[in-house]
């Protein structure tokens, strides 16, 4: 695998782990720190490069990372959308919805950027933050000729997979 792909996966996976294990519902979550905390786990000669890439994502507007079909710019687009989307004071978990919409609005490889952002946002805010209307629209495909899997079934499968 390309070193950038490995580094991006390590950084994002560790940020997801941190969101799951440390994020408190009523406290601010430091998205940037969660991603930067993984720098010590990537190959040493890539750390400075990725530190700079994270800085670009944190300081640059989401639209700066288009086109984003490459792992680095997709990573930056997802992080930028998350960080640059305000967390609503009244309903903080609406940040998941708002940041995903921001990620998609960047354009280009929208499904990839939204999937990357959604993994970290979901880890932080939980399945309950997914808007009900989105769950009714989501469908998957079964392996053989049969009816599509509904959003509700996908949610049940996910909950069973994590033992919830």
Locate the predicted segments by residue.
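Catalytic phosphate/nucleotide-handling subdomain of diverse soluble enzymes
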Residues: 1, 11-17, 73, 77-164
